[in-house]
Structures are given as C-alpha cells and as structure tokens.
Amino acid sequence: MQFGGFDWDSGNLPKCLGHGVSLAQIEALFRGDVYIVRDSVVGRERRTLAFGFGAGRWIFCVFTWRGDRIRPLSVRFMHDKEVKRYVEEISRLEER
C-alpha cells in the first residue's frame, strides 16, 4: 500500500495510543501486508477499516485519508476470535 506518511495530531494520537498500541506498531501495520475490509461514510468523511500484522501483533484500525496521508482514528489489538474469522476469510478469497 503506497501512501505519503501519517497525519498525527493532538486529536487522533492520544486516542490511538490509549488502546495500548504503540506509534511504531501502528505505522508498521501500514508498511506491511494490510487488508482493507471496507469503507463507510460518517458525516462527510470516508472511513476505512483495515487490519494486519504489525510489529508482532494483529491490529485493527479505522482510518481516513488526508490527501495521500493516512490519518488513524482508532486502533486496537485484535481479539483471537476476530483474527481467526478474518484470516479464514482471507484464505477463502485467495482460493478464488
């Protein structure tokens, strides 16, 4: 996934770090194999749901685009049941 960096400020950074995910782990997620689950529109803003393996843990992230930069809005570690469900879905899609 190509992008021009991250959009961090006093609004989104504390919220993302508040779930125990480090800045390095969040950024590693997007520099590795990230899976885009879906987009939705909240108000006038398109939000994208993504997950992947970043810095040794499965991570779930809601983000939006600011130009070519990623603006994480909420980030957390995934629960085992979520990981299993999404990995199974990826396997099914890759078999097609």
Regions found by a protein language model. Name each.
Residues 1-96:
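Ribonuclease/tRNase effector modules and their secretory precursors
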